[in-house]
Structure formats: structure tokens, C-alpha cells
A protein has these predicted regions:
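Short beta-strand->loop
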Residues: 90-95, 105-108
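Acidic/His-rich structured neighborhood in mature extracellular/periplasmic domains
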Residues: 5, 82-84, 88-91, 99-101
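Active-site SXXK
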Residues: 1-20, 44, 104-108, 159-162
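Short, solvent-exposed loop/turn and secondary-structure capping segments
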Residues: 9, 55-59
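Conserved active-site loop region of the serine DD-peptidase/beta-lactamase
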Residues: 113-131, 149, 153-183
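Amphipathic alpha-helical interface segments
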Residues: 62-86
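Active-site helix/loop module of the DD-peptidase/beta-lactamase fold
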Residues: 14-52, 82-86, 110-151
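Soluble non-cytosolic domains of exported or imported proteins
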Residues: 2, 18, 35-38, 71-75, ...
Length: 183
């Protein structure tokens, strides 16, 4: 989830996504007419999308069974999104769930030149990783990045060090990292 947020920051800094305040449906057409249609990237990355009536039955619950269903190929990300059609948002409280990360990843995949694969490759190159990394996609080609990024321990460390370096820099991505929660 943290790496998706980082790559989102790069997409914003590169101009592929205009701002954290943009609606997800402006980037992922399948979000139109769903519970998430008017959710901003800020809402999604901070897990405050107003989806407690869909993603869990209780605010703050992590019981949403999305991940298991998608990994076992019982449903695709797109099918889960469609199930939220015609639902209304609830109060925007923190509600941890994996689905929101994958929705943000889909937007980056659609709008970044070269897609999410290129965005992650750029991140890996900048960090100086040395081994192959990969992530899983569902049957429709939607990325599953809520927890399915694979890399060596050393490369994960290099990615973390790069995030730390960027945090401490006076750059667009540094400002994004320092201000994502308060933006």
C-alpha cells in the first residue's frame, strides 16, 4: 500500500494525475456509477472513502473479504467495483481495506505512460534494485498491489531507503511524502 502511494506521488509530480483532490472516476471509467465515483485520491490513499456500508459492516473493521476472493480468482477487481453500484457513501472515517489500494493502482496503470509496470520500474531503477520484482494482476489485467509486490529483502530495503531519501529532499515527491496525510 505504501509503495502504491509513493508511485501515486510520482504520477502526480510527473503530471500524469493532476492532484490528490481529483476523483477516481476521472481516471478509472469503471468507477462511474459506483460508491467510489466521487472519491478523491486523498480519500482512497488515506482509506477514508466512505465505504463502511460496502467494504465492511463496521467502521474501522478489516473484515472485508476482498483479497481472498480476488486471489482465489472467485471475483475480479472490476466485479467488486461493480458490486458497489448504486450504494451511497457513509461518513468518511478510516476504514482499512485492500480494495482502495488496487483502485488507485488501476488509475496509475491507465494514466501513466507505460502503465504501472513502467512506474514501478522507474522506482526500482531510482532505488538501485538488483533483482527481478513483480506484482500480480487479476484476470482482467487489473493490478493487485494491496500486498502482492514481490522483491528480495535487499531490494525492499533499497526501495525503503529511496523513499527515505525522497522524504528528506526538497523535491515534488519529497513534499508529497511529507504532506500526503494533511493534504
Amino acid at each position: 500500500k505504501s509503495f502504491v502511494s509513493y508511485v501515486l506521488g510520482n504520477a502526480i509530480c510527473n503530471g500524469d494525475i493532476k492532484s490528490l483532490d481529483d476523483k477516481i472516476s476521472d481516471y478509472v471509467p469503471e468507477a462511474k456509477g459506483t460508491l467510489y465515483e466521487n472519491s478523491s485520491f486523498k480519500d482512497l490513499t488515506n482509506m477514508r472513502a466512505g465505504d463502511t456500508n460496502f467494504a465492511s459492516r463496521k467502521a474501522g473493521s478489516a473484515t472485508f473479504i476482498y483479497a481472498g476472493q480476488v486471489i482465489q480468482k472467485k471475483k475480479t477487481v472490476k466485479e467488486y467495483l461493480a458490486e458497489s453500484s448504486n450504494l451511497k457513501t457513509t461518513k468518511k472515517v478510516f476504514n482499512y481495506n485492500n480494495f482502495l489500494t488496487d483502485l488507485v493502482a488501476r488509475a496509475i496503470d491507465l494514466k501513466s505512460p507505460g502503465g504501472l509496470k513502467k512506474a514501478y520500474q522507474d522506482f526500482a531503477d531510482k532505488a538501485g534494485t538488483s533483482s527481478e520484482m513483480f506484482f500480480i494482476i487479476d484476470d482482467n489485467g487489473w493490478p493487485l498491489l494491496h500486498g502482492w509486490t514481490y522483491a528480495t529483502r535487499e531490494d525492499f530495503l533499497k526501495l525503503g531507503i529511496q523513499v527515505s531519501k525522497d522524504w528528506n529532499s526538497n523535491t515534488c515527491i519529497g513534499d508529497y511524502l511529507k504532506n500526503i496525510v494533511s493534504m
